[in-house]
């Protein structure tokens, strides 16, 4: 029995290669179904995201190796011109389990501790299960990975602290104003960065969000998605600056979108009530002289990146705790695999002794009363349980290496004269 993982990710291949080898959900299901239905694999699962495409396979044939699976995926994607086996990693046995545990717990991600990957692993398992390609091995592997991720999230701080510019901006605003639900927010720019910032604001209970954008339809679409339905024409939003406690800018512009001259009258009308401006533009959208105004807090990308760097360092300090959780679960998973390997021998051993018991009792069936026969049966059951206890315990005992499992199995089968088991996936 073996479980293999091969794949490309942000560590092994550039984005062009990752894009070329990635699979849609339809392709994912078709690919794993083909592996299993063709008799190449007992089980198969594919995890395909923007940063990785990874296969998890329980081979049904000795020929199905890591190299075979690399070539099989390259051929399926018709990507031989662009993709080479050197772009892939390979993992085997418990190394495969360790890798998936690290992926699910977000320590193998491009951004350490990012929260999306667990949902993506769960989706990969769902696809495999629906395609009837997830058997006992992949099911146990994935559910253990889910358990690892849950423990990592609850017992460590690996996912705490903002590590994206848009989220760092919102986190900073929350630190300054505490309750964002009481604040009015202006978003200048409805592009990708602005959209992320608005969604993070909404997630932190900000509900009074007004959006302005050069293309008004884009602002309206985002406002509708958030459910705020509040927009301002880009040409006139500066007339309303005094209304806002938080201003987020994320536009592409050669000149400053906000200047000191814009904010001076706004602050006067606010009677110097505090305002935070979060400049997410590159180049900067906001005149740095604005920060000289009283009760004005201006933070740009460099300020936010400093926050991100500090948060990433805090996350890195949590890595030893994460690895300890993974090691603990890996030991348990390895012991479970070992139990699977010895299970046929345990079943054969028990069956042989039960057969002997039944034959011997049959000899006395008509020589003793039914009540005496039942007592004899209970007695022999207790004797068998005690006789088999030690060999079964020895087979199940934890081991340091998988090499000793065959020797244990062979010893028991030889001592008790058990026939060779039928070949199976375990």
UniProtKB/Swiss-Prot annotation:
Protein species of origin: Chlorobium chlorochromatii (strain CaD3)
Catalysed reactions, as listed in the record: (S)-4-amino-5-oxopentanoate + tRNA(Glu) + NADP(+) = L-glutamyl-tRNA(Glu) + NADPH + H(+)
Binding site for NADP(+): 189-194
Cross-referenced SUPFAM superfamilies: Glutamyl tRNA-reductase catalytic, N-terminal domain, Glutamyl tRNA-reductase dimerization domain, NAD(P)-binding Rossmann-fold domains
PROSITE patterns documented for this protein: GLUTR (PS00747)
An example Gene Ontology molecular-function term: NADP binding
EC number(s) reported in the record: 1.2.1.70
Name the UniProt record assigns to this protein: Glutamyl-tRNA reductase
């Amino acid at each position: 029995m073996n479980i293999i993982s091969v794949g490309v990710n942000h560590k092994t291949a550039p984005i062009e290669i990752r894009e070329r080898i990635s699979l849609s959900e339809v392709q994912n299901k078709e690919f794993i179904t083909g592996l299993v239905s063709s008799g190449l694999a007992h089980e198969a699962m594919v995890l395909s995201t923007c940063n990785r495409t990874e296969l998890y396979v329980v081979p049904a044939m000795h020929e199905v190796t890591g190299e075979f699976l690399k070539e099989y995926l390259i051929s399926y994607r018709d990507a031989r011109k662009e993709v080479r086996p050197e772009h892939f990693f390979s993992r085997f046995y418990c190394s495969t389990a360790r890798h998936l545990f690290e992926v699910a717990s977000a320590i193998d991600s491009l951004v350490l501790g990012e929260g999306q990957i667990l949902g993506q692993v769960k989706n990969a398992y769902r696809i495999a299960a629906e395609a009837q390609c997830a058997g006992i091995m992949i099911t146990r592997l994935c559910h253990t990975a889910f358990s690892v991720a849950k423990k990592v999230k609850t017992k460590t701080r690996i996912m705490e602290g903002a590590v994206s510019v848009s989220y760092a901006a919102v986190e900073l605003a929350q630190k300054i104003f505490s309750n964002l639900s009481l604040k009015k927010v202006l978003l200048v720019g409805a592009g990708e960065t602005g959209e992320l910032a608005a969604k993070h604001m909404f997630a932190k209970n900000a509900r009074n969000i007004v959006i302005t954008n050069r293309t008004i339809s884009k602002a309206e679409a985002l406002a509708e998605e958030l459910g705020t339905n509040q927009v301002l024409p880009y040409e006139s939003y500066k007339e309303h600056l005094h209304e806002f406690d938080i201003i987020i800018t994320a536009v592409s512009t050669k000149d400053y979108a906000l200047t000191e001259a814009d904010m001076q009258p706004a602050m006067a009308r606010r009677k110097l009530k505090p305002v935070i401006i979060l400049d997410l533009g590159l180049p900067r959208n906001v005149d740095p002289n604005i920060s000289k105004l009283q009760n004005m807090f201006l933070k740009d990308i460099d300020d936010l990146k400093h926050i991100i760097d500090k948060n990433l360092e805090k996350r890195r300090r949590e890595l030893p705790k994460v690895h300890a959780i993974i090691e603990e679960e890996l030991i348990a998973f390895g012991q479970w695999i070992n139990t699977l390997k010895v299970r046929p021998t345990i079943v054969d051993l028990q069956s042989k002794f039960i057969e002997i018991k039944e034959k011997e009792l049959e000899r006395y069936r008509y020589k003793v009363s039914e009540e005496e026969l039942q007592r004899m049966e209970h007695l022999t059951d207790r004797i068998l349980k005690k006789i088999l206890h030690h060999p079964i315990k020895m087979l199940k005992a934890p081991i340091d290496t998988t090499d000793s499992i065959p020797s244990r199995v062979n010893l028991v089968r030889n001592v008790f004269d058990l026939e060779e088991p039928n070949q199976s996936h375990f």
